[in-house]
């Protein structure tokens, strides 16, 4: 009986790790897909990403409530069904609606398939929000909590970074160079892979027994949220996480756009490769952090990476485009490599900000986690704002927005993360 339960848990752990990877896979489709839609509609490059992350604003708290009401297993199953529907809608946009004009924007006719794609991106956003709510606590629980639970989360996080690296790379290979003939059908293999993994994961989770924790009374959730927001360092941390997700997504997305828009043969593939290198840098950063986190404080790590990120961004902004090097047979501005290197810095920011922001919250930590999940919407809003700036100026100038956000995170690390509300009872 014990052996059967152990085998069941192993299958569930492997499945959760793959789902952890799929969260990043689905999320990071936004930039390469944005290249396709942005070529046809110059205003739409970041809209899919915006819809994907806007879902967090509406689904963050409901996901937590759903988790308490129906448990891990049923929430995960529901999320996978939602994900399949979202990916199917995105595929539908490649075969239907291109010849059906719905309205005009700035004198440009807008076809129905764009709206179908955006709906699919929103639905996928609901999916990844629900999965994010499930995967971390489920892996921790399956590991028995403590160090073993954290180890499983780190394994899942590594796979998450790996798929974040591969997604823009695969999309770039499939597309090559974005032209007027490029469409969503060119990247349909990615959508089919996603749907297949979700379907297989659904079947596995359905038949695997997963222990459900006792969540207790959830009626005081809103009161807990109000209590959590009494802490200044949490409020400042919530703003920091909002900016962080915008930074994490915005840097590689606009790096991809910048290189792709150079328009040479294979520019989309090279743009995807450079964006993938950013995510690979994040993978290296997360792996390296596991060895130093026990010796160096979170505040010190955050201060260092924020400062280095500012230096890399300023170097990328001020370095002339004429300073270039050959990369895969083409002259590429050196500044793009400074942008890709920022992945080393952003790799530890999510965990670092969360750790500093919830320090000393006690019973309010769970409510704070729900608030944090809502603020992931920054990954849609801030890259969209960066895209607006890029359209009115240029791609590199838009990185001043990222500089401002990183500067705020440096402020939070040095000053804003200090708990000045120790008089509030948390037990």
Question: PLM features: what roles do these ranges have?
Answer:
Residues 81-110, 307-328:
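C-terminal ends and interior cores of transmembrane alpha-helices
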Residues 130-144, 346-362:
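Intracellular juxtamembrane helix-capping segments at the cytosolic ends
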Residues 30-31, 230-276, 280:
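Extracytoplasmic gate region of multi-pass secondary transporters
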Residues 299-353:
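C-terminal transmembrane helical hairpin of 12-TM major facilitator-type secondary transporters
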Residues 149-209:
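Helix-loop-helix hairpin linking two adjacent transmembrane segments in secondary transporters
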Residues 11-39, 132-136, 251-259:
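Extracytoplasmic
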